[in-house]
């Protein structure tokens, strides 16, 4: 598995070479920014880079999904700071990630971002070996002196999408194609359902699990099974738009995840909970540059801008838009507690983040063990 190590555009123009690569046998790299696997974009436009940051993604960047959203955040901060050099490697399986983290640490980067849950233990192993390198793990629970963790309260955006779903549903039955039965995903299902139930007492959510983050055939199959159960709004927690397009093709409302997916759903698009990871990456690389970085457990929500819902689909009524906008304002100002009235009311952030493992009342069935 290669890690790309792209020099700055300024140095390219000076004729000092386009890129070098640290490689693992059997893999190649590309230095043509934005074109294919392992490509790299450098945005050092003024002087030599003072800070070098590396990102490791579990899937290909592509044009949609989890890794795409993270890479958009990387590109945004790279374009904003002329003192920052960025590198990334995509499509790294968790079992391969330790080697990639170690290669980046050996290459002299200042900070490494690992962007999937399965990287937690491999990153912790490497972080202990390289105390002078900073590490940030996305979605996990572990922190070390030189390893922080970060996530956004995307469940707040899911609550808003769920409220919209409850307002447009005619069968009172929502479908949810879920990834893995971990607290992150369970939180999303619960928040989505609570949002719907806040405007529709009769609503229920049916869930199908794929046990994958990216497997379009499995996602389509799960969505198809839900269509047979009279759902008329579909939600998902995967990188691809497969569940969304299955729903749109069947003529029902659909909500995506991670990235804007209106083009894939057309007139049946409701909205999507989406990420703006630059809201974390920017302050973090600034802290590294200013020698103020500290390992912490970042978990902010709508108020920070790290997450939101996408633009509305073309057929979403103004009444729906207005009601959801009012709810969004209540969440941001702190007057609405999403978990109020549920078994999770009053639970700590630690519990909500690490231990939520059961459904709220309006979700059918039980969370798989």
Where are these regions (language model features)?
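Terminal disorder- and signal-encoded targeting elements
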Residues: 1-131, 137-146, 167-173, 187-190, ...
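Generic detection of short hydrophobic beta-strand segments and adjacent strand-loop junctions
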Residues: 49, 150, 298-300
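Functional cleft and adjacent loop/helix regions within the main domain
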Residues: 79, 272-276, 292-293, 297-303
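Short beta-strand elements at the ligand-binding edges of bilobed clamshell
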Residues: 142-164, 178-181, 266-279
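Subtilisin-like peptidase catalytic core
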Residues: 180, 210-211
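Internal, active-site/partner-interface "lid" segment
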Residues: 182, 298, 302-312
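Membrane translocator/pore-forming domains, dominated by Gram-negative outer-membrane beta-barrels
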Residues: 214-215
